[in-house]
Amino acid sequence: MAATDTISLDTSEALAGLRARLTSARNADGGWAYYAGKASRLEPTCWALLAMGDASSDVLRQWPATDGLLLERRDGASNFGFHGLALLTLLDRKIEHQAGNGALVAGIQRVEGRASPRNQFSVQNNQLQAWSWMDETSSWVEPTTYCALALKKAARAGMPVDRERVLEADALLVDRCSVDGGWNYGNSNVVGKNLPSYVPTTALGLLSLQDRSSEDAVRRSLTWLEQEALSERSSIALSLALVALRVFGRPVQAIASALVQQIPTTLVLGNLHAAALALYALRTDHADAALVL
């Protein structure tokens, strides 16, 4: 964070409240649910481990997997997007999954979103295949961002990665970038109508494409996010915007202040995923290492 981006003094109180909530809501198995008292789920568990670097990570080391793919919850199905997030967490925390991180990297490279034939109602290239949320479904923006970023990080850690999978994922994100910049959840245009971009998906898209900063889609999306970051006031949207813009070296003071103001509401609502994301975003001592290439 730039020297001019000093976060307000009440941030320390917000950080303490978020950490206390996550600590008290942790399940006996070491994971976190979306809401206290519920079963542990992969997404909030990953963000909580990223946010609290000193928390025991045994739960993720032992997280159930089938055929190299992590399950979204115990006795559940694989979720490719959260598998990518888990890989980012494993690499950042220097955890070796019981199945081997190499097996998890290989597992996510075996699956891909379903291709669709070109048609007159879509301007995007539906032949591009990246990642879906679940098997036998079409590619979506969020799982593609998590998986592509995880593979880029894995490659930089010396793990075997199919570069063509990463390049096709990048191409899909560029292809689906909205006209004015940013990303919708799936498509940029349907039956001739441009779809709106959203802050969380745009932040994730930028993080995934941070090594492609010369792309016009990235420049347009960065401009869009700077303009629209405060338009979605949820802790999840503000947190992701804060992290993405910070990674790109842009000013984040206004977003950080808005996020701090949102923390009391986040704590009242009790969403542990949002609390973990906010704690990660407001901390600066980790230098966003989990998400930076």
PLM segments and residue spans:
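Protein-protein interaction modules outside structured cores
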Residues: 258-259
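Basic- and aromatic-enriched surface patches that contact anionic nucleotides/nucleic acids
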Residues: 262
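N-terminal capping segment at the start of a domain
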Residues: 26-28
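An alpha-helical repeat/solenoid feature that recognizes helix-turn-helix modules
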Residues: 1-16, 32-56, 71-109, 113-171, ...
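A short glycine/small-residue-enriched secondary-structure motif
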Residues: 56-70
